[in-house]
């Protein structure tokens, strides 16, 4: 979500804001998201919606969909109806298919307001 916001507002990637240093070691994603949302709002931009693809063999996303959407809603200030979450598998291919990794893709729509 953070990188999708940064891309939409034409900023650098997450590593620029939170480099791989001792200061940010084990930092939790919600703590990183807060200043990014602040920058978004400061730029007079609002999020219209998020479309999230969670790519994993297990667990089945459908089991956790509502909980994840509620969490993202709380962290972003978006209405749950503005967040779409889909689960995808890779049919047991690669590290994701072997349940050793999970990937996520996020598409964001934003609008500038005055």
Describe every region a protein language model picked out.
Residues 70:
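Active-site phosphate/pyrophosphate- and oxyanion-stabilizing loops and adjacent acidic/basic residues
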Residues 74-77, 106-108:
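Short, surface-exposed linear patches
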Residues 63-65, 94-97:
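Short, well-ordered secondary-structure micro-motifs
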Residues 96-114:
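C-terminal edge-of-domain segments
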Residues 79-82:
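Short acidic capping loops at alpha-helix termini that bridge into adjacent secondary structure
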Residues 1-67, 75-76:
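RNase III-family endoribonuclease catalytic core
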Residues 85-89:
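Pyridoxal 5′-phosphate
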